[in-house]
Amino acid sequence: MADRIASVERNTLETQIKVSINLDGTGKFNCVTGVPFLDHMLEQVARHGLIDLDIHAVGDLHIDAHHTVEDLGITLGQAFDIAVGDKKGIKRYGHAYVPLDEALSRVVIDFSGRPGLEMHVPFARASVGGFDVDLFSEFFHGFINHAKVTLHLDNLRGKNTHHQAETIFKAFGRALRMALEADERMAGQMPSTKGSL
C-alpha cells in the first residue's frame, strides 16, 4: 500500500486551516485551533486511531467557534479522502464501542463513497469546557461530506457531557483505524461487489 498521507489547506474570509495527516502513523498529534475542547477531542482521534494529525486553524472566534469547527471538519474530511486513495485493499468498515465511567458510545463507519450521518447523542448539557455541543454535528457533517463516508454515532448512555463527547471521539478514532487497516485477503481488490467506491 502506498504512503497514505495528505496535506490540505482551506482559506476563506472566515477561516485559514491547514491539516496534514498520516493514516499509518503512531498517533502523533500537533493541533492549535483556538478551540481547546475540540483540540482535546481531536487528540483522542489521533491516539486511538494511530493517525498522525497536524492541524493549524485560525478562525473568526470573536463571533463564535462555528466556522472554525465546521471548516475543520471539511478540511479533515478532504485530507482523509486524498490519503485513503482508491480504497483497494482496505477493510472499508469499522466499528467500536468505548466506555468512560458511566458513558458508553458506539461508532460505525463505512468508506462507502456515500456521505451520510446518523448522530444520536443526547448530551446532558448544552456546553462543555466553553464548547457548544451543537457544533459537534457541524464538525461531523463537514467530515462525512468531504471524506465521503457513512457514519453512525450513538451515545448509548451517559450523564457527564465531557464523558459522552470523549467516548464518541475515542470510538471514532478506533472505528477509523479498523476501517482503514489493510485486509491481506483483499490485497489490491476493491472492497465492493460494484468494483468501485
From Swiss-Prot:
Q: Which Pfam families match?
A: IGPD (PF00475)
Query: Which molecular function GO terms apply here?
Result: imidazoleglycerol-phosphate dehydratase activity
Where found?
Answer: Cytoplasm
Under the heading InterPro entries, the entry gives: IGPD_sf, ImidazoleglycerolP_deHydtase, ImidazoleglycerP_deHydtase_CS, Ribosomal_Su5_D2-typ_SF
Lyase is among the record's keywords: yes
The biological pathway it contributes to is:
Amino-acid biosynthesis; L-histidine biosynthesis; L-histidine from 5-phospho-alpha-D-ribose 1-diphosphate: step 6/9
Name the chemical reaction catalysed here: D-erythro-1-(imidazol-4-yl)glycerol 3-phosphate = 3-(imidazol-4-yl)-2-oxopropyl phosphate + H2O
Q: Which UniProt keywords apply?
A: Amino-acid biosynthesis, Cytoplasm, Histidine biosynthesis, Lyase
EC number(s) reported in the record: 4.2.1.19
Q: Name one GO cellular component term.
A: cytoplasm
Major place of localization?
Answer: cytoplasm
Question: What does the record list as GO biological process?
Answer: L-histidine biosynthetic process
State whether keyword Cytoplasm applies: yes
Indicate the family of this protein.
Belongs to the imidazoleglycerol-phosphate dehydratase family.
| HAMAP family listed in its UniProt record | HisB
Record protein name field: Imidazoleglycerol-phosphate dehydratase
Question: What is the originating organism of this protein?
Answer: Marinomonas sp. (strain MWYL1)
